[in-house]
Curated annotation (Swiss-Prot):
Encoding gene, per UniProt annotation: pyrB
EC number: 2.1.3.2
Protein name: Aspartate carbamoyltransferase catalytic subunit
Catalytic activity entry: carbamoyl phosphate + L-aspartate = N-carbamoyl-L-aspartate + phosphate + H(+)
PANTHER family assigned to the protein according to its UniProt record, in alphabetical order: ASPARTATE CARBAMOYLTRANSFERASE, ORNITHINE CARBAMOYLTRANSFERASE, MITOCHONDRIAL
First-level EC class: transferase
GO terms for MF: amino acid binding; aspartate carbamoyltransferase activity
Keyword terms: Pyrimidine biosynthesis, Transferase
Pathway: Pyrimidine metabolism; UMP biosynthesis via de novo pathway; (S)-dihydroorotate from bicarbonate: step 2/3
Species of provenance: Pediococcus pentosaceus (strain ATCC 25745 / CCUG 21536 / LMG 10740 / 183-1w)
Keyword rRNA processing: no
Amino acid sequence: MNMHDLTTVESFSEEDVLHKIRLAEEFKNGKTIELTRPVYAMNLFFENSTRTHTSFEMAESRLGMRLLEFEAKTSSVTKGESLLDTVKTIDAIQTDIAVIRHPQNDYYKQLLEADLNISIVNGGDGSGQHPSQSLLDMMTIYQEFNHFDGLKIAIAGDIAHSRVARSNAMLLNKLGAEVYFAGPEAWMAEDLKAYGTFLPIDELVEKVDVMMLLRIQNERISQDTAIKFEPHEYLQEYGLTFERADRMQPTAIIMHPAPVNRGTEIESSLVDGEKSRIFKQMTNGMYMRMAILTDVLEAKGLIKGGLH
């Protein structure tokens, strides 16, 4: 698989996923690489981010890359410059890799068609794809169960507006897992019906191996269609309460891509509880992003001696 760019999980095979997990685990165990020359990366985030942004920064730093600063609010984007021209600019100064998060779905397609030398890594596009989050989630699940086939995975919350739901549902299907969705009926996306079954959360808690919660994506919900919930009301109706968590299987785990709205989609203390793998996901995220970037570097011939 050509990893010059990583923009979507659509073309990933099971072997591609397992390769990424193995490589991430190697970095976790102390693997290092040597670059053939100074490598320059830039993270262009047009939406707010804590985990993805800092995780990529840490991954780039650990791999010995040189990071160029970019702030959307102080860039020429505020003067009307298009995303394409912004990326063509940083390509012109010979930046090697751009990690981009953008509110527009499929923003990366125009960049891939522009015949640029710079590699594009998708840090999240609107409600479309979030490949690095999906891969770190697969790593977390694999660490727990050592397989995907036949696992029952519930994705619960604001499904319609979630790029994590789309990427994970798509990838989990390819890996042989059974996917279920839960949440307000108005937020059940039609395009995801091909990937899983929609059921009330009370029907799912006892049967699933993984309960993956999602926050309400207020920034993507138009005001005229917004469903208004008080946090406690939403928790009781659609979230993971103590009572529901008590009914989960002994080996089942709780996941969340974060940020977590404690007391809304999940009881606060469950975030730090025995079943939670939420902060483990974040640690895995750094190593998985090292793996993602390493495959890009390898495709560009920038690793001394190649990847072994």
